Amino acid sequence: MRVRLIAVGNKMPKWVTEGYDEYAKRLPKDFALELVEIPMSPRGKNTDIPKAIRKEGDSMLEAIPSGDKVIAMEVLGKEWSTDQLADQTEQWRMDGYNVSLLVGGPDGLDPRCTARADQTWSLSRLTLPHPMVRVILAEQIYRAWTLMNNHPYHR
């Protein structure tokens, strides 16, 4: 199984890259976590934000492999517990699906990405910085894998 994290932004602070990499490298090759970085459209005081979001959305939609289950990360999505994430992930694995998780930039996801998603998931009702979401998702994917494999990380 492969979980592809498709996220807007490609110039992350060192702590984000290190945090993400720490959890991604812990996963076995048969349960790979792959990061696909979508360049963020330039932002300035005269930026047409909807146009920038559409451009990012175009790139995100192109990055989704056919056949993947698609999960859009949205503040108003469904909140899952870690156990629910592990159960859902195990079901996807048993059904032979790979998964693409979509994380928007500072102005959110293109509505077409949300429409393309099979499910929407929320980490919190709080608005989280999009770089931090990468680290949290990587840790939660790793934690779900440990639950599925009776690993002592999740107690």
UniProtKB/Swiss-Prot annotation:
Q: Which residues bind S-adenosyl-L-methionine?
A: G104, L123, S124, R125, L126, T127, L128
Q: Where in the cell is it found?
A: Cytoplasm
E.C. number(s) listed in UniProt: 2.1.1.177
The record ties this protein, via InterPro entries, to: Alpha/beta_knot_MTases, RlmH-like, tRNA_m1G_MTases_N
Major localization listed first in the record, in broad terms = cytoplasm
One cellular-component annotation, GO? cytoplasm
Task: Name the Pfam families on file.
Answer: SPOUT_MTase
GO molecular function terms noted in the UniProt entry: rRNA (pseudouridine-N3-)-methyltransferase activity
Keywords linked to the UniProt accession = Cytoplasm, Methyltransferase, rRNA processing, S-adenosyl-L-methionine, Transferase
Keyword Metal-binding in annotation: no
- Which top EC class applies here? transferase
Annotated catalysed reactions: pseudouridine(1915) in 23S rRNA + S-adenosyl-L-methionine = N(3)-methylpseudouridine(1915) in 23S rRNA + S-adenosyl-L-homocysteine + H(+)
Tell me the HAMAP family matching this sequence: 23SrRNA_methyltr_H
Quaternary structure, per UniProt, is: Homodimer.
What does the UniProt function comment say about this protein? Specifically methylates the pseudouridine at position 1915 (m3Psi1915) in 23S rRNA.
UniProt family annotation: Belongs to the RNA methyltransferase RlmH family.
- What this protein is called in its record is Ribosomal RNA large subunit methyltransferase H
